[in-house]
């Protein structure tokens, strides 16, 4: 096993916490963005922010 200094362990913990935060709070907005960027399937109405909010 690799020996890490206390400072290196703290930096890795911060990196993992930051990654967790980004994945948790960034996944849904990313999916929504990609959906709007791609557009609707042929024959389906265009997505709008209101249709997203009201279902």
UniProtKB/Swiss-Prot annotation:
Subcellular location: Mitochondrion outer membrane
Segments traversing the membrane: 21-36
Membrane side Mitochondrial intermembrane: residue ranges: 37-55
Record membrane topology: Single-pass membrane protein
Keywords (A to Z) from UniProt: Disease variant, Membrane, Mitochondrion, Mitochondrion outer membrane, Protein transport, Transmembrane, Transmembrane helix, Transport
Pfam family, one: Tom7
Entry's Gene Ontology molecular function annotations: protein transmembrane transporter activity
Listed InterPro entries: Tom7
Gene Ontology biological-process annotations: positive regulation of protein targeting to mitochondrion; positive regulation of type 2 mitophagy; protein import into mitochondrial matrix; protein insertion into mitochondrial outer membrane; regulation of protein stability
Cytoplasmic topological segments: 1-20
Top-level lineage group: Eukaryota
Disease: Garg-Mishra progeroid syndrome: An autosomal recessive syndrome characterized by a progeroid appearance, severe dwarfism, mandibular hypoplasia, hyperopia, and partial lipodystrophy.
Sequence similarity: Belongs to the Tom7 family.
Function: Required for assembly and stability of the TOM complex. Positive regulator of PRKN translocation to damaged mitochondria. Acts probably by stabilizing PINK1 on the outer membrane of depolarized mitochondria.
Self-association and partners: Forms part of the preprotein translocase complex of the outer mitochondrial membrane (TOM complex) which consists of at least 7 different proteins (TOMM5, TOMM6, TOMM7, TOMM20, TOMM22, TOMM40 and TOMM70).
Protein name: Mitochondrial import receptor subunit TOM7 homolog
Phylogenetic placement of the source organism: Eukaryota, Metazoa, Chordata, Craniata, Vertebrata
